[in-house]
Every structure is written in C-alpha cells, then in structure tokens.
Amino acid sequence: MVRIATYASHSALQILKGAKDEGFGTIAFGKPRVKLLYTKYFPVADYFLEGDYPEDKLLELDAVVIPTGSFIAHLGVELVEKMRVPYFGNKEVLKWESDRSLERKWLEKAKLTLPRIYEDPDDIDRPVIVKPHGAKGGRGYFIAKSSKDFWEKAEKFLGIRSKEDLKNVQIQEYVVGVPIYPHYFYSKITGELELMSIDRRYESNVDAIGRIPSREQLDLDLDVTYTVVGNIPLVLRESLLMDVIEAGERVVKASEELMGGLWGPFCLEGVFTPDMEFVVFEISARIVAGTNLFINGSPYTWLKYDEPMSTGRRIAREIKIAIEEGKLEEVVT
C-alpha cells in the first residue's frame, strides 16, 4: 500500500492533509522537536520518522516522497538524486533549478522575458539584486547600486572578496514592478497545465522598512534584506492571466526538450512591470510555501474543481490516478 511521505517542514502540513483527503496513509520525517506538530497539534501524519532521510524505513513503508524546498536544502541535490525511495517528479530538474546558469538557459529556451545578468560586477550600471544559488528562502540576497556598493555588500553578507568567489552567485538587474508568484501543476498523465493559485511574499526586512519614515531610514542606514517570513494571497487582474498561463506552458515545453520534462507543482517568480509585462526572475521546480495559503483551495482551483483542492491534494490525486491506471512509474523517479 503506497503511502505519501515528505520532510517535516515547509509545506508538509498541506501535503499530508491533501494525501489524507485522497485516502493515503501519510509519513512525516525530520527533527524530533517537530513530531507533535504533525501528530498532535495538526494530526496529519500517521507515522513520524526521526532523521533527515530514514531511507530503509521509508522503503519498508512503501513511501513516495514529495520534494519540498526544505528537503532539497537539507539533503542537497546530490543525495536526492541518489535516493532509492520513489520521488514524485523528475530528479533531473533539480540540477537545472539549483544552478542559476542552467536555470537561465531553461528560461531563455522558454522564451520568457528575463532581467539582464551581469557576469562582471565592474559592469554594474544600474541597480542589481544579488542572489546566491539554491533554495534558501531569500537569505543572502542584497541590492547593489554600483560596483563599489556590490563589493562592500558582497563581503558583508556573503564573505565574497574576489571574482573567483562569484561562481555561486548571480548578479541580476533589479526590475521594478509588482512581485507575483504563480503556482502551477502540470499533469504528466493528462498533459494539462493548471494554474493553482498566486501569492506574493512578505520579506524581512524589505517589506517592513516602509513603516519607518524616510528621514529615520536615512539616519538608521539600513541594509535591505529579502528573507521570506510569510506569504500573502493574490488574485491577478483577469486580463493578465493568459500571460502567466502561457509562460507556464512554455516552461513545460522547454523542459521536455532539455531534461525529459517537468511535472507536478512548480512556481515562476517574477514581477509585472508598469507596462504590464511579466518579467520572470527564476523558477522553483517543486511545491512552494506560498501554496500553504490555499489548503482549502484557491479562487482558481474552485473554478476547475468545485471542491477544496490544494496543491498538496492535487499531488496526491495525481499519484492516486497514476496507481489506478498502472502508471505510477511514469510519475516517479
């Protein structure tokens, strides 16, 4: 009997609740301290296994692991690629998502509008945002206005002192606009893309600085940071929905040519500019924490399903359909 398992963090509550709604047994695994969160306060886990990745026990319980950002961050891409436990999704996608140069190639292949990338900090001629590689919830991001500003902040925030240390960061043009994070689900079984929900992030300290009068901001000499602390639901202007949907379709098509396909949940992270252009910064090729806003469904999933449908439940339903049709091996790697 297949059970659905995930690392006890990030979006595990939503994933396991969705799995229960679809009739699956559930497993959370992770640090002992959080056991009661998943078994008592929010009783969504039938089993709680201690450890970052208790592989033998997961195999014994016939688990299918659902990846999250926390899971990838804790184990690392190399270990996840070697997992013996069935993994929902295409593991090949991981290296394309975690390496910003490969990610850029993917998004360019999808013909999305992207910000300029600066290979040399000395070429900075406008505001840029500097991003370390990997899924870290915005930690280590910073804004720089010039080459001099870049080097000062790179040493302060990331310990970078020379160009030889730049291989693990990306210097990206800062595009002004409204941040949006559309959440998608692509079904390998039906070949259909679904827009599940949309959010924007609440980040520390950038979203709190506006509460401080400008004069005091200058006196405090604050450094802006972008660590994600929460999420805010967003319903997009209806005339912009096709821009978002078409971007998702192109990303899936490009993935089929580059890495054998992307299926399951993913998110494009970008902004709508004042000219109503959707500029994409990066992709999260897995469930994102912004979907936690919609455990009982979103305005978009209600239009399609007429029942509560979270991204976590949609994952479980895909696995359920795959089992019923004898296609489970097609949706796990």
Curated annotation (Swiss-Prot):
Pathway: Purine metabolism; IMP biosynthesis via de novo pathway; 5-formamido-1-(5-phospho-D-ribosyl)imidazole-4-carboxamide from 5-amino-1-(5-phospho-D-ribosyl)imidazole-4-carboxamide (formate route): step 1/1
Enzyme class: ligase
Catalytic activity: 5-amino-1-(5-phospho-beta-D-ribosyl)imidazole-4-carboxamide + formate + ATP = 5-formamido-1-(5-phospho-D-ribosyl)imidazole-4-carboxamide + ADP + phosphate
Amino-acid positions noted as binding 5-amino-1-(5-phospho-beta-D-ribosyl)imidazole-4-carboxamide in the UniProt annotation, renumbered to this chain: H10, S70, N231
Residue numbers binding ATP: 121-181, 203
Co-factor remark: Binds 1 Mg(2+) or Mn(2+) ion per subunit.
One Pfam family matching this protein: DUF1246
UniProt superkingdom: Archaea
Cofactor(s) required, per the database record: Mg(2+); Mn(2+)
Keyword hit for Cell division: no
Coiled coil, from the record: none
GO-annotated biological processes: 'de novo' IMP biosynthetic process
PANTHER family, per the entry: 5-FORMAMINOIMIDAZOLE-4-CARBOXAMIDE-1-(BETA)-D-RIBOFURANOSYL 5'-MONOPHOSPHATE SYNTHETASE, 5-FORMAMINOIMIDAZOLE-4-CARBOXAMIDE-1-(BETA)-D-RIBOFURANOSYL 5'-MONOPHOSPHATE SYNTHETASE-RELATED
Family in the record: Belongs to the phosphohexose mutase family.
Protein name: 5-formaminoimidazole-4-carboxamide-1-(beta)-D-ribofuranosyl 5'-monophosphate synthetase
Natural source organism: Pyrococcus horikoshii (strain ATCC 700860 / DSM 12428 / JCM 9974 / NBRC 100139 / OT-3)
Gene name linked to the record: purP
